Amino acid sequence: MTQTHSTELFKPNRAFAKTARIKNLCEYEDLRLDAEEDFEGFWGKLAKEKIDWMEPFSKVLDESEAPFYKWFVGGKLNVCAQCLDRHLDTRKNKAAIIFEGELGDSRIITYRELFYEVKRTANLLKNKFNVKKGDRVVIYMPMIPEAAFMMLACARIGAIHSVVFGGFSAEALRDRIIDAEAKLVITADGAYRRGKPYMLKPVVDDALAEGACPSIEKVLIVIRNKEEINYVPGRDYIYNEMIGLESAHCPPEPMDAEDPLFLLYTSGSTGKPKGVQHNQAGYILWAQTTMEWVFDVKENDTYWCTADVGWITGHTYIVYGPLAMGATTVMYEGVPIYPDTGRWWKMIEHYRVNQFYTAPTAIRLLHKEGKEEPKKYNLSNLKVLGTVGEPINPDAWNWYYNEIGGGQCPIVDTWWQTETGGHMISPLPGATPIKPGCATLPLPGIFAEVIDEEGNPKPAGEQGYLCITKPWPSMIRNIWGDPKRYESSYFSTCKKNGKPVYFAGDGAIRDERGYITITGRMDDVINVSGHRLGTAEIESAIAKHPGVAETAVVSRLDEIKGESVYAFIVLKPGYEDNVAEELQLLKEINAVITREIGPLAKADTMLFVPGLPKTRSGKIMRRILRSIARGEEITQDTSTLEDPAIVQKIQQLA
């Protein structure tokens, strides 16, 4: 899939713009200049307006230990109270969460009901599982409301939650439990996917087998699909049997603005996943502010983000952001094509969804598999469409804009990351003329620049490093337990005025208007269906197969997923030159990847090769392999390779 970008601009819908929070580019420019002229004043004003402080902050920003920035120093708050307690006077009977299961079961949970459910859950964690402020709790759950209950309950009592995507393997789950030194695992028996039950509890059992996670004291299980599970007496407890016995009185714990709120593990360019640490005040401020600015959600709107709570998009734009601003957020358990490709459009019609936020992968899939399906449904309540996780190609953009949005809904093509906490570059739906496939302009207060390593701006049309040159409140605070890796991962590539700045890992191009187009990763991370996978992590998994001598993994462009995994594999003696065995090897190696990481990381293509292109110092030249995988001309200098002839040999096999 080649990424070509239109130069045509789509102006905001005038009727929409009249009632938008930011109505035109002049208002955007005023906010941008406010941040430029009085940086701390800009953020301090937002924090005072939007957060219900238990104690006021004394200092907006402390840069004394940069890049370990501290925001809203001295302030105290509770994120759960920000999401629930403060809405009870005016919104107690408003729907907070609308849940639909894949089999069609549904629940509407009001703010009052959610408030009481979360307080009971918080008491259960405190009283029965001895979870205290600062303890880590791993949540390995499907897309059901109880996942949100658990996150908010942790926030209420000051525990640090770490949600692990339910598609990850036992090994991946174990690694995250060990790194976080978690006290408790919360899971479900299972859930439903593609109309069938799938299991989560056995994965937890495997992760904890043979005392592999000594920090874990107990396992709390939510019963969802009622399939038979293994029950370990003294360790395993059923949430559904215990929650009704708990009191609904649980005052929120006052938390320092810089206390950790959650950890979320993300792939890095080295093998070990990074525990991205987000803290209290800055995170919730930007989650709420971007909900208001980017989606322009109004009091009576229904908002739906199709992500999973196991990813940052689910944290910020299913749970924390919508609830902090008092919105109605939709949660859906299953896949977009069950029982057919009209499932999402049927839900948009039924729940009268006004803002819809999804990944380009899903749009491409539905465009390919059910192009005419949207015509069967009334989608006229939609006001804003959004995309997240990867760049969107113009064909998919045009179908989304015309067929789903009826040519009336602005598309907010949002660029941000696990590490940024919330949107960084995005159109504002009432203000920004939209360019298909382009993230457009940095949000007010965000100083995103396309520069070289020394901080010099790249000329218009020329690719450079996408860097954020000033701190922002929702930024990553640390990599859990590894401050050196935090500095080396994010602040060692680029400088501005001699000072290290945050490098996002992405390349970008800025045009004459100042619009920013993301060109893709500049490090060894693959973006599959909007999910980041580290090449080193996949390579480590493949290397565990006894027949593999050496491997290198790169990305290949994919029409549906954006990128797919392409593995070049050197086999050990005795495994080569046997076609029948090679087919079996392909299955076995993907089984290893699934076991070690999860099915998302499986290689779509494997090529058995006699060797890999290496420099004389032993470094594998992945850019050459990426060019081969994508069928591109090799422009890199191969004369410095240890064996220049290996490139031609690999090309012939590919």
Curated annotation (Swiss-Prot):
Keywords of the record: Acetylation, ATP-binding, Ligase, Magnesium, Metal-binding, Nucleotide-binding
Domain of life of the source: Bacteria
Sites where the protein binds Mg(2+): H545, V548
Any Gene Ontology biological process: acetyl-CoA biosynthetic process from acetate
Annotated PROSITE patterns: AMP_BINDING
EC number(s) stated in the UniProt entry for this protein: 6.2.1.1
Cofactor(s) the protein needs: Mg(2+)
GO molecular function: acetate-CoA ligase activity; AMP binding; ATP binding; metal ion binding
Pfam families, alphabetized: ACAS_N (PF16177), AMP-binding (PF00501), AMP-binding_C (PF13193)
Residue positions binding CoA: R193, R194, G195, K196, T313, S529
Family to which the UniProt record says this protein belongs: Belongs to the ATP-dependent AMP-binding enzyme family.
Purpose of the protein: Catalyzes the conversion of acetate into acetyl-CoA (AcCoA), an essential intermediate at the junction of anabolic and catabolic pathways. AcsA undergoes a two-step reaction. In the first half reaction, AcsA combines acetate with ATP to form acetyl-adenylate (AcAMP) intermediate. In the second half reaction, it can then transfer the acetyl group from AcAMP to the sulfhydryl group of CoA, forming the product AcCoA.
Name of the protein described by the UniProt record: Acetyl-coenzyme A synthetase
